[in-house]
């Protein structure tokens, strides 16, 4: 049976269920490595790798056909010399982080409007001075410019 290695501990149980189901339909067995590392003596049995492996470890995946990074940018993994074969297919997880980035945008906007970084510094120094002026997003017009799922 073909094998898939999934690296990292960031997946929720429903992700595991979906990966297991899809892999089984495609004839793959799945092994999870929450610590992000596949022992070198086992790496050669995997045709598919998902996660963010150490670049130096990629050559130990001697049967590797497809590496899918668990992130959007794969620039650090573009060098063919990293892989046991120049035929390894490299893909990313672009599109998986839209909700996370949207929520991050709201969080950072509120932090800026409420001077969160200044308050953290003041609290760390045990200074409880006057309240800094704060703005609300209520009634504001906000424009977000970008392209794609996270832009």
What residue ranges belong to the model's regions?
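Short, well-ordered beta-strand segments
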Residues: 4-6, 68, 91, 143
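Electropositive phosphate-/nucleotide-binding environments in soluble metabolic enzymes
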Residues: 13, 99, 103, 148
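Phosphate/diphosphate ligand-binding glycine-rich loop within oxidoreductases
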Residues: 45-123, 134-135
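A generic local structural motif
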Residues: 16-17, 34-38, 51-56, 77-79, ...
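Phosphate-coordination loops involved in phosphoryl transfer and adenosine-cofactor binding
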Residues: 1, 87, 138-141
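Glycine-rich NAD(P)-binding loop of Rossmann-like domains
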Residues: 119-151
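Short beta-strand/turn micro-motifs composed of small residues
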Residues: 7-8, 51, 71, 146
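N-terminal glycine-/charge-rich "phosphate-binding" loop or analogous flexible N-terminal tail
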Residues: 1-48
